[in-house]
Amino acid sequence: MTPPRSRLQRAGMSRDIVYFDLETQRTANDVGGWDKKRDMGMSLGVTYSTRLGEYQIFSEKRVDDLVQQLLRADLVVGFNVINFDYEVLMGYTVLDLPHQCRTLDLMVDIEKKLGHRLGLDAVASASLGVGKTGDGLDAIRWWREGRVLEIAEYCCFDVKCTKLVHEFGATNKKVLYDDRFKQRKNVAVEWVV
């Protein structure tokens, strides 16, 4: 039996899943602590839209366009997007993004099941055999050095890893990770694409 078609499918439109990540201009230490994420400033934000089939890179000047794309999405998928990326973006808008965007935060979902956090690199490396190409501190250093292209490449790769982890989990109903003893484990997920 085939599942019923969604309103979008009946209208001939595909569901728009928007994969999202951003990098910041400043560290938590620079702004006085992790409770001041809204002061970190976005250096670049990157999305991948399944409806458009393309990546988009947003500078700080285009943050309103980024927010609008997230609000219009049928689903926003990110890794630590609720407690980090949205908090940074809320330094630019009065909108309550965690409550106004339909969101699947892969890290939060995994944490609920395991009782502890995993990083994107741990899940992507074990599930896909590919790891991250840097970290947020690299991106901040590149920002200070004016190396915006490196930030864009790094952030695009993180968005791609997030997309591939989501698709892997949706297909296999689990994702893999290596625990602190380097033992390969898996965690069941109920994600859909």
Where are these regions (language model features)?
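Short, amphipathic C-terminal "tail helix"
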Residues: A188-V193
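A polyampholytic, Gly/Pro-enriched intrinsically disordered region
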Residues: R117-T133
